[in-house]
Every structure is written in structure tokens, then in C-alpha cells.
Amino acid sequence: MKNYEIAAMSRKELLEKIDELENRLADINFHKAIEPPQNPMVFRNSKRDIARMKTRLRQMELQESSNA
């Protein structure tokens, strides 16, 4: 997921997408323990997407608190 796509998301959309990606990451971890992954970059990219989204959420929180 690209940064401009994340920046365009609302708070609710970000929370839903983070939840979805964390569930997918748990599935990937489970399958990784059983057999080697076909594409190990999926794990890495999922972790990075989650981090980007959490960073964007934090930026939104800080922006709201500074405006209030």
C-alpha cells in the first residue's frame, strides 16, 4: 500500500485496515511455522504497511490534540 493511499484514508478506515492486516499477519505467521512461505516479502510488506498506518493514526491524533 502506498503512502498517498494511507494519507487519503479516514481514521475509521485505517483502524479497519490495521485490524485486517494484523489478522493476515497472524495467518502468515501460522503458515510460516508449518511450511516455508512461497513469498517471504508478503510478511515484510504486511509489517511495514501496519507500521505506516499506525504512524498515520498517531499523526492524526497529534494534529487533533494540537488543534483542540
Swiss-Prot record:
User: Which terms does the record give in the GO molecular function aspect?
Assistant: structural constituent of ribosome
Q: Which UniProt keywords apply?
A: Ribonucleoprotein, Ribosomal protein
What InterPro entries does UniProt report for this protein, alphabetically?
A: Ribosomal_uL29, Ribosomal_uL29_CS, Ribosomal_uL29_sf
Q: Which GO terms describe its cellular component?
A: ribonucleoprotein complex; ribosome
GO terms under biological process: translation
Q: Where are the transmembrane segments?
A: none
Recorded family membership: Belongs to the universal ribosomal protein uL29 family.
Q: Which HAMAP family match?
A: Ribosomal_uL29
Please give the name of this protein.
Answer: Large ribosomal subunit protein uL29
Name of the coding gene: rpmC
